[in-house]
Regions:
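Canonical positions in the second alpha-helix
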Residues: 3-4, 38-41, 75
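Short coil turns that delineate tetratricopeptide repeat
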Residues: 9, 43-46, 80
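TPR alpha-solenoid repeat register
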Residues: 14, 48-51, 85
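Alpha-helical solenoid repeat scaffolds, predominantly canonical TPR units
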Residues: 34-37, 71
């Protein structure tokens, strides 16, 4: 029997591929729905780097900031594609300071 984490990550990867196809075919509502589901699945594995990368990617696709500052140090150790997420954190902090 496969580990539940492996099953979740296989589902996340498959859902991400499907969302990319929907984005390419301009079916944005369906792509957004898949990205929301990816974020929910990734929330089950908050300390896993791969899940964090997929969550950040999906949040970027949804134009939502990454709000958990607890793992900002983990973000700094991720690949360069996650720099957009760091900019989203900065944007969120700036907006919060003006409130």
């Amino acid at each position: 029997m496969q580990d539940k984490n492996n099953i979740d990550f296989e589902n996340i990867m498959r859902m991400n591929e499907i969302a990319e196809v929907y984005e390419l075919t301009k079916q944005n509502k369906k792509a957004e729905n898949y990205h929301r589901n990816i974020v929910k699945l990734c929330d089950r594995h908050p300390k896993n780097e791969t899940a964090l990368q997929y969550k950040i990617h999906s949040l970027n696709q949804l134009n939502k900031p990454y709000k958990s500052l607890e793992t900002t140090n983990e973000l700094l150790n991720l690949n360069p594609n996650s720099l957009i997420a760091l900019f989203n954190i900065i944007k969120f902090l700036k907006e919060a300071s003006y409130v």
